[in-house]
């Protein structure tokens, strides 16, 4: 029996967040960072190589794989096929990646006046991670799910004082 545990679990062992708020004269500023550590992402080796006519191959895989016509021994990915390949679909540390990340989840800047406040808010603005294939917050799999959307809002809040 030569099996052993590798990497970290696919559920983060550490999740964290922090975010201060500041006011200076008529301006306010707040942000929130969220992150995860001690987590692995298992890229699904089956999905890109699935059944004929049912799936597409991610571009980064299609650009760098071994084939008989392109026998690049330094290719990043194993051979492609329209059918299941036993050598490509077995669980392997080849598909395991570090899934740690730090995200700037929210940032808001506002200007306060006596009767109103104007603000600009952004969500999911930046991601810092060694994992570059898809949003690491999506976790393991194929990366073909919808990622967290980046959102920008501009708003005005009015106050009526008696």
What are these regions (language model features)?
Residues 1-10, 70:
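Conserved small-residue
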Residues 12-16, 96, 100-105, 148-152:
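Residues that define the transmembrane beta-barrel architecture of outer-membrane proteins
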Residues 19-23, 32, 110-112, 145, ...:
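Transmembrane beta-barrel domains of outer membrane proteins
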Residues 24-26, 35-39, 106, 122-129, ...:
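Transmembrane beta-strands of outer-membrane beta-barrel pores
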Residues 26-29, 115-116:
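Repeated loop/turn-to-beta-strand initiation elements of outer-membrane beta-barrel proteins
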Residues 31, 118-120, 156:
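Membrane-embedded beta-strand positions of outer-membrane beta-barrel proteins
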Residues 36-117, 122:
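Extracytoplasmic gating/loop element in the C-terminal half of outer-membrane beta-barrel translocons
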Residues 65-72, 76, 89, 127-162:
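C-terminal beta-signal and terminal closure region of outer-membrane beta-barrel proteins
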């Amino acid at each position: 029996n030569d099996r052993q545990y590798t990497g970290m679990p696919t559920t983060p062992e550490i999740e964290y967040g922090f975010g201060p708020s500041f006011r200076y004269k008529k301006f306010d500023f707040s942000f929130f960072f969220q992150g995860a550590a001690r987590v692995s992402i298992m890229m699904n080796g089956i999905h890109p190589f699935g059944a004929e006519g049912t799936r597409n191959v991610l571009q980064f895989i299609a650009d760098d794989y071994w084939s008989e016509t392109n026998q690049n021994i330094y290719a990043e990915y194993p051979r492609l096929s329209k059918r299941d390949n036993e050598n490509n679909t077995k669980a392997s540390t080849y598909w395991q990646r570090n899934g740690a990340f730090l995200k700037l989840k929210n940032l808001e800047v506002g200007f306060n006046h006596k009767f109103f406040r104007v603000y600009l808010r952004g969500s999911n603005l930046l991601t810092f991670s060694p994992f570059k294939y898809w949003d690491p917050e999506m976790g393991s799999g194929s990366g073909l799910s919808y990622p967290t959307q980046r959102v920008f809002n501009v708003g005005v809040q009015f106050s009526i004082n008696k």
